[in-house]
Regions:
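Conserved beta-propeller blade repeats
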Residues: 31-46, 81-99, 120, 127-145, ...
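Short, solvent-exposed loop/turn segments at conserved positions within beta-propeller repeat blades
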Residues: 56-61, 103-108, 185-190, 236-243, ...
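Bacterial Sec-dependent N-terminal signal peptides
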Residues: 1-23
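Predominantly five- to eight-bladed beta-propeller fold
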Residues: 61-62, 147-195, 229, 240-244, ...
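Beta-strand-rich domains and repeat architectures in extracellular enzymes and scaffolds
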Residues: 26-62
Length: 476
């Protein structure tokens, strides 16, 4: 009986290997991946954005899903078919705020999902789509940024257009230096402002009023102020790298500038005790690439200091440790996304590898993570052989709890991706690269070679899942 069983197992295994096919462009429409995983304050559940491809519209779709920390109870959060994003747990863990698209073109609203009743409802009626939603510490408000249009410039008054007439589009007139952008085209005239809305619903309140773009922000511990990034310089259009950190009361008063130097100061996060602001930045030396460093200051802007991590890598996405004794962050090292931690004295350590998998196409970096009140971390975990799934770090080890593409990728031979280093013939510098070998690679055969040069560390490539690279290596 044992011999028969062995024959059956070997036969099944061989059949499985033979049934694997190469990755194709049609497979791109079957890919799904995790974005923006958010763990509940008490570790009970994780909510994340599940991104899929719609072959009928040639576009991406996104919906919210929830899963327990052990990988069970994996199910869609709502019954909506709209695009959903930006899930954020309330401080008490009883609600989830999120953004959902509406019937209006490119429009979206803020929704609340009540965890106990499993009901959800829109709480806003906004003129534009909200971004960067964030709960106030007392749970009473949700802060966000939103674009506010300026009046359209007019050089002349056009003649009266007859009813049902078909005329050419009106001319676009701008007085802005930056009026177009790659990927988005013409930019409407206006600025992004800070807003807040009651978590019970109501009229949104515009907090900022200055005619500048307001970006990343955090709340003060008492929920009475917003700490945010902007550039209030008269020459803000020409100082495209420069930004400062400001504070403002939620009623729009008591605006204060907390930083003042030539360079970007951004990404403020307030410590658990409310006394310290951690932020990112560097002194601009007008170079193509400059290392983004970690800084801290008192809540009033005093006692600014750099936390010297000796990492020699740019960092991003700061998160305070629950005990306030250190800060977590993202960084890239040799083409691999990492989560790191530093104490307030600058003692740094790596927490997790393989952060990324959310930039489907080329092997760019990216990814995100979140943390519970007990310090458990969830993040987008990826390798060259699968896009982002959910990884959990419990303080000891990393565990992958989803496998969204098992049905597809287990039946595909993706070849192999290997790290290579070589020496520059110009200056002897060590240069890193990766070679993607085709399925069923035979070292005794010759293959055509595609070389794609790409710089770093700006938008670096790495050992990440990339349909573009897979399709190259799978081609005959």
């Amino acid at each position: 009986m044992k011999n028969y069983l062995s024959i059956i197992l070997i036969t099944c295994s061989t059949t499985f290997l033979l049934s694997q096919t190469r990755f194709s462009n049609q497979d791109v429409f079957e890919i799904q991946y995790v974005k923006d995983p958010q763990i509940a304050p008490n570790n009970s559940q994780i909510v994340y954005v599940r991104t899929s491809m719609d072959i009928m519209t040639d576009s991406k779709t996104s919906s919210l899903w929830k899963i327990s920390g052990d990988g069970t109870e994996h199910q869609k959060l709502t019954s909506s078919t709209a695009n959903e994003s930006s899930p954020r747990w309330s401080p008490d863990g009883k609600k989830i705020a999120f953004v959902s698209s509406t019937d209006d073109e490119n429009g979206s609203e803020i929704y609340i999902y009540w965890v106990e009743s499993k009901q959800y409802s829109s709480i806003s009626q906004l003129k534009q789509s909200p971004k960067n939603i964030r709960w106030s510490p007392d749970g009473k408000y949700i802060g966000f940024t939103m674009f506010v249009e300026d009046d359209v410039l007019k050089l002349v008054s056009p003649p009266q257009k007859p009813d049902n007439a078909t005329w050419a589009p009106a001319p676009r007139i701008t007085d802005r230096l930056k009026h177009e952008a790659d990927g988005s085209g013409y930019m409407e005239k206006g600025f992004h402002h800070l807003f807040m809305i009651s978590s019970e619903g109501g009229t949104p309140i515009q907090v900022s009023s200055e005619s500048y773009n307001h970006q990343s922000f955090d709340w003060s511990k008492d929920s009475k102020k917003m700490i945010f990034t902007s550039n209030y310089s008269e020459n803000w259009e020409y100082e495209f790298r420069n930004s400062e950190i400001y504070s403002i009361k939620v009623d729009g008063s008591d605006l204060k500038q907390l930083t003042d130097r030539n360079g970007p100061d951004r990404g403020p996060v307030v410590s658990p005790d409310g006394r310290t602001i951690a932020y990112l930045g560097y002194l601009d030396k007008v170079q193509t690439y400059q290392v983004t460093k970690l800084y801290m200051m008192n809540i009033d802007g005093s006692n600014k200091r750099e936390i010297k991590t000796n990492l020699d890598r740019s960092i991003s996405s700061l998160r305070w440790a629950p005990d306030g004794k250190g800060v977590y962050f993202k960084y890239d090292n040799h083409g691999n996304g990492k989560i790191g931690y530093t104490s307030l004295s600058g003692k740094t350590k790596k927490i997790a590898d393989n952060l990324g998998g959310t930039s489907i196409g080329r092997p760019y970096g990216g990814g995100s993570y979140s943390m519970s009140k007990t310090g458990k971390i969830v993040y987008t975990l990826s390798t060259p052989y699968h896009p982002a799934d959910i990884g959990i770090f419990d303080g000891r080890k990393v565990q992958r709890i989803t496998n969204l593409n098992f049905d597809l990728l287990s039946n595909r031979d993706l070849g192999t991706v290997e790290d290579i280093w070589y020496t520059s013939s110009v200056d002897g510098r060590k240069i890193q690269g990766w070679i993607a070998k085709p399925p069923e690679f035979d070292k005794n055969k010759k293959y055509p070679l595609i070389v794609e040069n790409h710089g770093g560390p700006i938008s670096n490539y790495g050992d990440r899942f990339s349909p573009e690279i897979l399709l190259y290596s799978a081609s005959d």
